[in-house]
Amino acid sequence: MDEAEYGRFVDWDKMEAGGQEQSPKVLSCTDFQELKQMARQGHWAKSHTLRAKVYQKLIKEIPCRTVTPDASVYRDIVGKIVGKRSASSLPLPEFVDDRQIPSYSLNSEGTGAVRKIISCISNQFPDISFCPALPSLVALLLHYSQDEAECFENVSRILACNDPNRRLVDQTFLAFESSCMTFGDLAGKYCQGPHKLMVAVSEDVLELYSDWQRWIFGELPFAYITRVFDVFLVEGYKVLFRVALALLKFFHKVRGGQPMESNNVKRDLQMFVRDLNKCVTPEKLLEKAFAIRLFSRKEIQLLQMANEKALQQKGITVKQKRQNVHLAVHAENFTSEIVSVKEMRDIWSWIPERFALSQPLLLFTNREHGNSLSRFYLHCEGHEPTLLLIKTTNQEVCGAFLSTDWSERKRSGNKLSFFGTGECFVFRLQPEVERYEWVVIKHPELGKVNSSSADKEANSSQSDKDGIDPSSRLSPFLATRHFNLPSKTASMFMAGSIDCIIIGGGDGQALYLDPDLNYGRTSHCNTFNNQPLCSETFQISIIEVWGFKDNMNNDGAHSALH
């Protein structure tokens, strides 16, 4: 029997029937691109033994730290750790967050083995402080292990991966939380319809997205998680983001037209993923996942690092009540002459997650500080990012999220020069809501650059004297000054001088404001591929600029808490 060698922990009566002998018993492929296609196409999905041997091969090739516990270590310690206790009664360590162990059609020996292996992992990896995916990972790999010790060694190698460019499993709350924030960022950009629905029906969309890994490692049926894991072992962490975004898209497609209650949407999502086989095949799930044109692995890594840094700056490195992590726009604390609390919450759902940690902070309003561009700069410099809100005399409302400090304009002297990053976006709220993001998000081919020219530009424009590590500026999405993109006009984010402010450029300007902040104009521009944000020429009634209050550093501006 095919399962004899690797089926010791499996209850075969509960497993879905499937062809077992239709694939070769060895993996001869060594070319990465070919291996990637085989994984995506489910080449070893039909043979339990082949999949087991592929997993063994791929996991053995993971670069690990020098001292990584192996099967012999497990055999030495398991008796001491378990003692005379029943395996089924072993408590799970706190770092798995009391998550229920997915059964994955394991037999009673298998479910006990999961607890024994996790207990030994806890003993050998004292640096793990938060790893909710671990029970699912162990239960899955038990299917493809000859004994507990082999499973322990394979899990240990995944946890001990030391390739800085190959993120596999989050093992701290900081890493986990920043992953949730990164998923929220990606959902806002690549799943705008589903994200809008989640914001509308959820009291806390960030709390909802904190479950994104559980959808995969916990809720997905076994036939689906194995197909995902096939690709994950070849391509890495980015696959998980793709699959979770695809799940969100399918949920929106299937449930979007049905009434949902805010207190049930989290459970509804979990149930939808658990019963995914009722509406979506594993092939369709992966097809949808890989149809999403995500940013590069480098881009996502930079975004993750930025989110981690934001959490560290807030002192958030260990698990705590979520309301202490994400601070919402509270009705009793927020006052604007342009937008309502609900509208500000909608805007908050659009901004990068690391800034949603902060509260809105009023920096400038023409009602208090006057209609003067010089005063605008005076009150806004030193703050990044900022949120610009404009209300016209015709009661139209529009604005922009601006990623970069306005003092950056001084680098070019008196010359009007564009700066900013791909996180900038423009929007209108009245008469209808519409957001326009960087055109490269939907058309990544516009952002493809010659790597050598990008590196050269990055190194020349960002010197060590300003205290910025050039390696953190190699991304056209996060870099302050755009690189040699095929179309320069696709990266004209923001510019300012004593004579005007311009947001968005290339064959028009998304927003142009005069030096007295009295009049402006708006049109289509290449950077955001936007429609005019209001009447093409308009008179400003009210203008507000909001910053993001760092709770660790309360400066003199007007906080929305007052």
Swiss-Prot record:
<dbReference type="GO" id="GO:0005096">
    <property type="term" value="F:GTPase activator activity"/>
</dbReference>
<feature type="domain" description="Rab-GAP TBC">
    <location>
        <begin position="42"/>
        <end position="259"/>
    </location>
</feature>
<feature type="region of interest" description="Disordered">
    <location>
        <begin position="450"/>
        <end position="471"/>
    </location>
</feature>
<dbReference type="Pfam" id="PF07534">
    <property type="entry name" value="TLD"/>
</dbReference>
<keyword id="KW-0968">Cytoplasmic vesicle</keyword>
<keyword id="KW-0770">Synapse</keyword>
<feature type="domain" description="TLDc">
    <location>
        <begin position="337"/>
        <end position="549"/>
    </location>
</feature>
<keyword id="KW-0963">Cytoplasm</keyword>
<dbReference type="GO" id="GO:0042995">
    <property type="term" value="C:cell projection"/>
</dbReference>
<feature type="binding site">
    <location>
        <position position="238"/>
    </location>
    <ligand>
        <name>a 1,2-diacyl-sn-glycero-3-phospho-(1D-myo-inositol)</name>
    </ligand>
</feature>
<keyword id="KW-1003">Cell membrane</keyword>
<feature type="binding site">
    <location>
        <position position="40"/>
    </location>
    <ligand>
        <name>a 1,2-diacyl-sn-glycero-3-phospho-(1D-myo-inositol)</name>
    </ligand>
</feature>
<keyword id="KW-0966">Cell projection</keyword>
<comment type="function">
    <text>May act as a GTPase-activating protein for Rab family protein(s). Involved in neuronal projections development, probably through a negative modulation of ARF6 function. Involved in the regulation of synaptic vesicle trafficking.</text>
</comment>
<keyword id="KW-0343">GTPase activation</keyword>
<keyword id="KW-0472">Membrane</keyword>
<feature type="binding site">
    <location>
        <begin position="293"/>
        <end position="297"/>
    </location>
    <ligand>
        <name>a 1,2-diacyl-sn-glycero-3-phospho-(1D-myo-inositol)</name>
    </ligand>
</feature>
<dbReference type="InterPro" id="IPR006571">
    <property type="entry name" value="TLDc_dom"/>
</dbReference>
<dbReference type="InterPro" id="IPR000195">
    <property type="entry name" value="Rab-GAP-TBC_dom"/>
</dbReference>
<feature type="compositionally biased region" description="Basic and acidic residues">
    <location>
        <begin position="454"/>
        <end position="468"/>
    </location>
</feature>
<feature type="binding site">
    <location>
        <position position="242"/>
    </location>
    <ligand>
        <name>a 1,2-diacyl-sn-glycero-3-phospho-(1D-myo-inositol)</name>
    </ligand>
</feature>
<protein>
    <recommendedName>
        <fullName>TBC1 domain family member 24</fullName>
    </recommendedName>
</protein>
<dbReference type="GO" id="GO:0098793">
    <property type="term" value="C:presynapse"/>
</dbReference>
<feature type="binding site">
    <location>
        <position position="36"/>
    </location>
    <ligand>
        <name>a 1,2-diacyl-sn-glycero-3-phospho-(1D-myo-inositol)</name>
    </ligand>
</feature>
<dbReference type="InterPro" id="IPR035969">
    <property type="entry name" value="Rab-GAP_TBC_sf"/>
</dbReference>
<dbReference type="Pfam" id="PF00566">
    <property type="entry name" value="RabGAP-TBC"/>
</dbReference>
<dbReference type="GO" id="GO:0030659">
    <property type="term" value="C:cytoplasmic vesicle membrane"/>
</dbReference>
<dbReference type="GO" id="GO:0005886">
    <property type="term" value="C:plasma membrane"/>
</dbReference>
<comment type="subunit">
    <text>Interacts with ARF6.</text>
</comment>
